[in-house]
Curated annotation (Swiss-Prot):
Keywords: Calcium, Capsid protein, Intermediate capsid protein, Metal-binding, Ubl conjugation, Virion, Zinc. Zn(2+) binds at residue 153. Ca(2+) binds at residues 266, 286. Pfam families: Rota_Capsid_VP6. GO terms for biological process: fusion of virus membrane with host plasma membrane. It comes from the Viruses. It is found in: Virion. Residues 62-73 are annotated as: Interaction with the inner capsid protein VP2. GO terms for cellular component: viral envelope; viral intermediate capsid. The VP6 trimer contains a zinc ion located at the center of the molecule. The zinc ion is not essential for either trimerization or transcription activity of the DLP. Zinc-depleted VP6 has an increased sensitivity to proteases. This is Intermediate capsid protein VP6. Its main location: virion. The N-terminus is blocked.
Length: 397
């Protein structure tokens, strides 16, 4: 894997810097690295593809070295270099695609394609060895079963979940109380509602709670907490739990009271925040518990009192909500996040070449299915294919 990265980095630098008019002295070190790559690759043969509709391609390396010059690089020099660069880039692209479409239930962190296995040989270590990138460093750590650490921006840690629970229900669905939520990606939105605005509740207060268990532990997380859930702030028709009918939800938004957020690890509370909104942090956690209250306003103007009558019918439905958004965090496992396109790259290649469903990944690389059952085998394979996708993105956008 590190050799593949070094190949890509050398080719990217060569493609960007070996251009007509450049002083040779400015790129002499790069050309030496480029020539070392050619010397190492010459005389070797590789084969890629042969899975799904990914075509079999044979690769043979027999290229001349780039020479020296005291002057600027001319058009002939650059054209010769460009022909070599294009062939190598095409080769790296196909090695990456060949690797991205393969999976294994055992040792999925290791190269799975014949071409990448061959590149892992000791003879290729002379190719401008460079393992300074974060993703290569983490791949090497995972390969040695040492602790990794990935920094994510808006990590897709929550499987998609959208539903509701009713704590009070009537056959006519005209006086309900309960909770509804939407968990997806890096965000939780949860709302508590009471059609009667807590008129008969103790102290005219309804208590709500929402617990979310993560599939992986997050550390040093920066989080935004807001006293609102905008996705539940407009009217909607909701299908009943048994699917037999529908009920109407017409929210009027109140501010949640006595808000408490707990971050837990293995059942133990690590961080607690009470009525603190904006930016908060959590050290390490695998569970989030949100609790909040809906309190009937003790004093209301006539206009507000008309919204919340003392008896049915309840045309407007008192609602309070919270939004919790993970802005950044560190995780030992690889995840999709807002800064990367690796999941999209891997999925696109697998779809384009009609790769058959394998023993590890869910059909279509569906992220909710993948993260819901994030097994060690999936973790290993995902880190490998994401690493390869990152390397490929250096050359192919």
């Amino acid at each position: 894997m590190d050799v593949l990265y070094s190949l890509s980095k050398t080719l990217k630098d060569a493609r960007d810097k070996i251009v007509e008019g450049t002083l040779y002295s400015n790129v002499s070190d790069l050309i030496q690295q480029f020539n070392q790559m050619i010397i190492t690759m010459n005389g070797n043969e590789f084969q890629t593809g042969g899975i799904g509709n990914l075509p079999i391609r044979n690769w043979n390396f027999d290229f001349g070295l780039l020479g020296t010059t005291l002057l600027n690089l001319d058009a002939n020099y650059v054209e010769t270099a460009r022909n070599t660069i294009d062939y190598f880039v095409d080769f790296v692209d196909n090695v990456c695609m060949d690797e991205m479409v393969r999976e294994s239930q055992r040792n999925g962190i290791a190269p799975q394609s014949d071409s990448l296995r061959k590149l892992s040989g000791i003879k290729f270590k002379r190719i401008n060895f460079d393992a300074t990138s974060e993703i290569i460093e983490n791949w090497n750590l995972q390969n040695r079963r040492q602790r990794t650490g990935f920094i994510f921006h808006k990590p897709n840690i929550f499987p998609y979940s959208a539903s509701f629970t009713l704590n009070r229900s009537q056959p006519a669905h005209d006086n309900l109380m309960g909770t509804m939520w939407l968990n997806a990606g890096s965000e939780i939105q949860v709302a508590g509602f009471d059609y009667s605005c807590a008129i008969n509740a103790p102290a005219n207060t309804q208590q709500f709670e929402h617990i979310v268990q993560l599939r992986r532990v997050l550390t040093t997380a920066t989080i935004t907490l807001l006293p609102d859930a905008e996705r539940f702030s407009f009217p909607r028709v909701i299908t009943s739990a048994d699917g037999a009918t529908t009920w109407y939800f017409n929210p009027v938004i109140l501010r949640p009271a006595n808000v408490e957020v707990e971050f837990l690890l293995n059942g133990q509370v690590v961080n607690t925040y009470q009525a603190k909104f904006g930016t908060i942090i959590a050290r390490n956690f695998d569970t989030i518990r949100l609790s909040f209250q809906l309190m009937r306003p003790p004093n209301m103007t006539p206009a507000v009192a008309a919204l919340f009558p003392n008896a049915q019918p309840f045309e407007f439905h008192a609602t309070v909500g919270l939004t919790l958004r993970i802005e950044s965090a560190v995780c030992e496992s690889v995840l999709a996040d807002a800064n990367e396109t690796m999941l999209a790259n891997v999925t696109a290649v697998r779809q384009e070449y009609a790769i058959p469903i394998g023993p590890v990944f869910p059909p279509g690389m569906n992220w909710t299915d993948l993260i819901t059952n994030y097994s060690p085998s999936r973790e290993d394979n995902l880190q490998r294919v994401f690493t390869v996708a990152s390397i490929r993105s250096m050359l192919v956008k």
